[in-house]
């Protein structure tokens, strides 16, 4: 369904024109249900010869009005052509109506942008809607790696995007600090602790002492172990330096390891420009009784029963047995099978624990969005069923899937990090190319599409590198404005001063094309927020940068298109208003992506 663009900022040309289209439709089709009118969309045309924008209004109204779309479109054309802002209206295809606006209407977009400043593109679409976005939630068992990086950037940009669309957003990180992986981390840290205090014990010798083998052998645990040794000396080992009974050391090492690993993760996130408002602990959630409360609530609704699940599809696990378990009737809420909440031994399943955590989030949110790796596909329907059951359908649950990232340099996969032992760390990536390049590149493709992160391409100063291309456009804009300050005085080129420029000088096809692009930004924000696709904003940045560079290049051949005319102040100010509007829109878009626009290229 089309977004209700009446909620867009009042400076949005698409919002104002859509209101006029809806009024015309009501006039042409009296008594049309309002829910049909609210679905009317107004989209930028891809081909300028088809006008500036197109609407589906006639096609939406055809069925309820029991009339042909072309007939309604013809009447809409007459109504819309009579509007003072419209230069041309024509029916097209099966019932579209294309609109061409008068140049002064497009020229006014620059003024709207200058007046809106950093608020350009923001709307009230999501006003009153509380959205919880959970992202990263990396296990605190090692450094953040490139896989975490994509989810972190996508989640953070999505949160920014939803805020720009008017939602109240909570950014949350779930600390998986209870379970077998934390146990494995604790044992691995203790092994490094023994080595730090001088005990000669290899991984092969220590591994048999652990519950499930020595799973984490990266060098990143050595500083953690050293910190523990500095604080506790040899007190956590036997007199001869050998392994002590876990009752002596386990809880101390677990606590220290978790604290330091989370501190390292927070530092990595800060370096990536990410800040969460909430860090929720799995251990605290389990201790709070929320899991049992959620299970009890489902039981009170008659949604639990004792039963035996069908055997897993595909290869049968050797240890699988048909055992009675407490099952949740998730199929009643769209899942493909009922799900186990309690095992035959009375312990909760991981899914049950996760339900308790999501129920906790749902207490303060209208929509829950989890940003997860692509291997969590089977998770969506079961959790959506649980949230729907617990909240009587009042809280929505969505998942944004992030595909894997392959890092290459010189055409070859990047060597694994020695520090991490098994993967390319986030710090490796940031040290190599910088925060803004990492963030923008991670957002150049849809989250569920696989990505190759080419370290050479990301730092190349060519038009084929979208990071450079977009930043260069902003830097060029700022360079023009600085030159204008020297030529005409700083007071002359402020946004306030440029608002009074005679914009009729912006009349060339290439200038009007840029203005069309600028006019579409608020709509792009809402469309991206509705689709939960922040990569659309990166695409918008690339398209706007392309339009600007095309205008710059045309100015080399056609002097009338140049931005500065020392002997023609009026024309210069009009061009500068456009340049300032481009820079401002790029800044607003990059802010959503969490990227800092550069003032000059170095």
Swiss-Prot record:
Record InterPro entries: aa-tRNA-synth_I_CS, Arg-tRNA-ligase, Arg-tRNA-synth_N, Arg-tRNA-synth_N_sf, ArgRS_core, DALR_anticod-bd, Rossmann-like_a/b/a_fold, tRNAsynth_Ia_anticodon-bd
Reactions mediated catalytically: tRNA(Arg) + L-arginine + ATP = L-arginyl-tRNA(Arg) + AMP + diphosphate
CDD domains, per database record: ArgRS_core (cd00671)
Gene Ontology molecular functions: arginine-tRNA ligase activity; ATP binding
Cellular compartment(s): Cytoplasm
Pfam families: Arg_tRNA_synt_N (PF03485), DALR_1 (PF05746), tRNA-synt_1d (PF00750)
PANTHER family tied to this protein: ARGININE--TRNA LIGASE, CYTOPLASMIC, ARGINYL-TRNA SYNTHETASE
Listed NCBIfam families: argS (TIGR00456)
Family classification: Belongs to the class-I aminoacyl-tRNA synthetase family.
Protein's UniProt name: Arginine--tRNA ligase
